[in-house]
């Protein structure tokens, strides 16, 4: 069984764990509707994606 030869310092432990943090999702403003949406996702209000109609718009 593998056993560490040296104790891992708090600095090294923290550097290893720095990649585990949850990042807030990014949002962009839609050019057509002005609504906030995730990048590379369909705008659910208008049903548009990359200038094409891919879904029927939601009725509000």
From Swiss-Prot:
Keywords assigned by UniProt, alphabetized: Ribonucleoprotein, Ribosomal protein
Any one Gene Ontology cellular component term annotated for this protein: large ribosomal subunit
InterPro entries, A to Z: Ribosomal_bL32, Ribosomal_bL32_bact, Ribosomal_zn-bd
Pfam families named in the record: Ribosomal_L32p (PF01783)
Domain of life where this protein originates: Bacteria
Chain positions covered by the region annotation Disordered: 1-60
GO molecular function, one term: structural constituent of ribosome
Composition bias, Basic and acidic residues: 28-44
Family the entry assigns: Belongs to the bacterial ribosomal protein bL32 family.
NCBIfam families attached to this UniProt entry: rpmF_bact (TIGR01031)
Full protein name: Large ribosomal subunit protein bL32
The species this protein was found in: Mesorhizobium japonicum (strain LMG 29417 / CECT 9101 / MAFF 303099) (Mesorhizobium loti (strain MAFF 303099))
